[in-house]
């Protein structure tokens, strides 16, 4: 049977509806006797068209059959009969489905959200289309909303009148002492910040329960809240929330105040991109440090360092210049080599000592050394004072 129908569809002419390929699914009914609609498997001649199908009394083309035209084929969907019909009328479907369309003809998916949207703490718009109330994962920071009845003493109940009237809002936990309502006018209380409201038509005011500290919705409404659909961490809309509405442009005053911020930092504005302050500074000017006061070194007197004191050689030269043939008795004492050797280190050591001493003491010791050298040259070396040499 399926082979005959497939061959018949392939031999149709081009002036009729285009039917390239069909996947025909004909579920066989349990009862072979279907008298109301006649034979469910009917053969149509080759010259006949799909539009000339015999009319079925139990189904109407406008009510029960849905024609969906596709560029590559034709689909016929026959709705199953209702449950009130006789058990003989089993639901059957005659579906003619074409091949899946090309991926190029499929609608282009929407572009991914921008980077700014990904960074913001917002809920996508698709959540508003969900039928069940959206609740996040259990956390310490979030608590779900409990809907109370009109008396307020009944147990929590969720309204089931209509899906668009469901209210789903989440907020941070408050202290247990938060037992004020935003509906009465004599109790001015601002709606809580960081509340995530997800409502389409919310006609109930907001109230804070003393047990959980979360904002709830009462059945008693003094004035209906305006319709809202908010997906940001901003104040919830209440009957008197018009004064709490943020401006169109975000400002430091409109942003919520963090409760854990220190007291000194609560009035500080929000951080903005500050202009570069390097232009105000002078470029190319180096900071000159004050020169460190260097300690004054003692000045060295090179004339005094070059002066030679009286020594044995000086005494010998002076006596030779005078031309005296008779040498004094102290010259004979200075002539032996061992004594002259002992005389020369005294002059060298005294000269080294005079160069290493400071300027203040140098002048005093210079005179002492000169006097001692004269006394050394004038007296006999037999009675040399070793203590005097060590001091010099």
UniProtKB/Swiss-Prot annotation:
Q: Which Pfam families match?
A: FAM53
Q: Which domain of life is it from?
A: Eukaryota
- PTM-bearing positions, type N-acetylmethionine: 1
Where do Basic and acidic residues bias regions lie?
278-294
Segments of this protein annotated with the region Disordered: 78-119, 141-167, 204-294, 341-364
Q: Which InterPro entries match?
A: FAM53
List residues traversing the bilayer. none
Keyword Acetylation listed: yes
- Give the keywords, sorted: Acetylation, Phosphoprotein
**GO process annotations (BP):** protein import into nucleus
Q: Which residues carry this modification: Phosphoserine?
A: 122, 162, 232, 234, 255, 273, 299
State where composition is biased (Low complexity): 241-256
| Gene Ontology CC annotation, any one | nucleus
* Polar residues: compositionally biased ranges: 83-93
What family name appears in the similarity comment? Answer: Belongs to the FAM53 family.
* Protein name, entry field: Protein FAM53C
Organism, by scientific name, is Homo sapiens
Q: What is the lineage of its organism?
A: Eukaryota, Metazoa, Chordata, Craniata, Vertebrata
> What is the primary gene name for this protein?
FAM53C
């Amino acid at each position: 049977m399926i082979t005959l129908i497939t061959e018949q569809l392939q031999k149709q002419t081009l002036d009729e509806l285009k039917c390239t390929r069909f996947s025909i699914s004909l579920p066989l009914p349990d009862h072979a006797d279907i008298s109301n609609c006649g034979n469910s498997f009917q053969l149509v001649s080759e010259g006949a068209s799909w539009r000339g199908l015999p009319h079925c009394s139990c189904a109407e083309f406008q009510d029960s059959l849905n024609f969906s035209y596709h560029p590559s084929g034709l689909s016929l969907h026959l709705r199953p009969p209702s449950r009130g019909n006789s058990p003989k009328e089993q639901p059957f479907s005659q579906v003619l489905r074409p091949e899946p369309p090309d991926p190029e003809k499929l609608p282009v998916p929407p572009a991914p959200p921008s980077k700014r949207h990904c960074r913001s703490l917002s809920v996508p718009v698709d959540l508003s289309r969900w039928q069940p109330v959206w609740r996040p994962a259990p956390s310490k920071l979030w608590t779900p909303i409990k809907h109370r009845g009109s008396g307020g003493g009944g147990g929590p109940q969720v309204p089931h009148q209509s899906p668009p009237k469901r209210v789903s809002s989440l907020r941070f936990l408050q202290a247990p002492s938060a037992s004020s309502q935003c509906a009465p006018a004599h109790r001015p209380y601002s709606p809580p910040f960081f509340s995530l409201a997800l409502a389409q038509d919310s006609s109930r005011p907001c109230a804070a329960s003393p047990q959980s500290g979360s904002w709830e919705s009462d059945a008693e409404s003094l004035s209906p809240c305006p319709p809202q659909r908010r997906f940001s961490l901003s104040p919830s809309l209440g009957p008197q929330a018009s004064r709490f509405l943020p401006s169109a442009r975000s400002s430091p005053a409109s942003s919520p105040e963090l409760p854990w911020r220190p007291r000194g930092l609560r009035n500080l504005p929000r951080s903005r991109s500050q202009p570069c302050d390097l232009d105000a500074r002078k470029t190319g000017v180096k900071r000159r440090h004050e020169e460190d006061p260097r300690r004054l070194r003692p000045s060295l007197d090179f004339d005094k360092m070059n002066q030679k004191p009286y020594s044995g050689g000086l005494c010998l030269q002076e006596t030779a210049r005078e031309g005296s043939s008779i040498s004094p008795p102290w010259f004979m004492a200075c002539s032996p080599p061992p004594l002259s050797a002992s005389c020369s280190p005294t002059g060298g050591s005294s000269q080294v000592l005079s160069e290493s001493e400071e300027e203040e003491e140098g002048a005093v010791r210079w005179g002492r050394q000169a006097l001692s050298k004269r006394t050394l040259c004038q007296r006999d070396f037999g009675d040399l004072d070793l203590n005097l040499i060590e001091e010099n």
